[in-house]
């Protein structure tokens, strides 16, 4: 049985004051979680204050530095807290569960993501939402990421841009430095598979805010596209079958989550 208190949740957040409290509360109730960190990435609202009221440990970027930077900040904070709080000779690295800030109360259903990692069956899990949210224009970026991952590894994930992921500390350190901005998920998948690590997709009943078709949403997708393209540009050309050749096995198929 996995030990209790072996998972830290890291939530990058920017201007999510309307959902962050519910997200933190849901995450804090997950099995194995004893630490929830919110990294406020230059919010203009009271995201940080609300996260703190909900019980999270809050870190703040003075300006918007991007999702990957927020993930690194949160993971480093976990490491420092572990080094400070653990008695001599008892340090044990927590697994890292990354969740989006806009999950709201559905964050409490993320438990199945941690199970393969806590059981030693996977080095990273990727969420597959059982109920897809329609997002205008988002398919172009998903297609770019999925095709790039497939070219690099011979495997195409169902939801390559899904940011809900659980990693061992060793897997996270293997992937550092993280690719910038919104290219982080694409790069994580490629880099860990190339390193011979085990990646599993897990179905979970999570949901978040849909991206619209207004000007701000279109700019957001343009930034996503550019970040994913940059992450892929430095990881090609790649040989199909590289993963199987180095690790002896390919990624696992989608694993149904257990409630």
What are these regions (language model features)?
Residues 16-19, 43, 106:
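Donor nucleotide-sugar binding loop of glycosyltransferases
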Residues 39, 61, 99-101:
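Catalytic metal- and UDP-sugar-binding loop of GT-A-like glycosyltransferases, i.e.
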Residues 62-77, 91-93, 106-178, 182, ...:
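Acceptor/aglycone-binding surface of glycosyltransferases and processive sugar-polymer synthases
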Residues 15-29:
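Short, well-formed alpha-helical segments that are part of the catalytic scaffolds
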